[in-house]
């Protein structure tokens, strides 16, 4: 059966490609008080990423757990951001993110360090494709705030190429010289 296109030229009935991995971070039972008592439902927090530099998070509420997870996953796919990765495994520079009372510090790490991060931050780094990072969260331990603070910090990351382009310089002019550092240490 041939695929048909709709009026806007988009493919119809196209299944979502399984290029994204997702991780359920938190699931809570929530209640709404109504005239006759309480109505219970579920809230899900999901992180989605392609493990190649794109990540997003979403939250969904529903009366059943699978429906809440589905809603959260759809929202996460709509809210994805792109983060430049150094050598496809770590961050380009140290950064700081904040949301509410949640503060997060993220530092680059040498190869083989692994992901040193707690709870929700680890899920974000794994879905992003980061293999080496050291991070610390201070303040709020609420998973929503921790993820938002992490995303806030990741949005601030800039690759040396983009910084050089903005300044009108070459990448080599911005990065520290490798040959000069050991020579200065010996003197």
Swiss-Prot record:
Residues 155-187 are annotated as: Disordered. One of its GO terms (cellular component) is small ribosomal subunit. Pfam families: Ribosomal_S5 (PF00333), Ribosomal_S5_C (PF03719). Residues 20-83 form the S5 DRBM domain. This is Small ribosomal subunit protein uS5. One of its GO terms (biological process) is translation. InterPro entries: Ribosomal_Su5_D2-typ_SF (IPR020568), Ribosomal_uS5 (IPR000851), Ribosomal_uS5_bac-type (IPR005712), Ribosomal_uS5_C (IPR005324), Ribosomal_uS5_N (IPR013810), Ribosomal_uS5_N_CS (IPR018192), Ribsml_uS5_D2-typ_fold_subgr (IPR014721). One of its GO terms (molecular function) is rRNA binding. Keywords: Ribonucleoprotein, Ribosomal protein, RNA-binding, rRNA-binding. It comes from Ruegeria sp. (strain TM1040). HAMAP family: Ribosomal_uS5_B. Residues 170-181 have a biased composition (Basic and acidic residues).
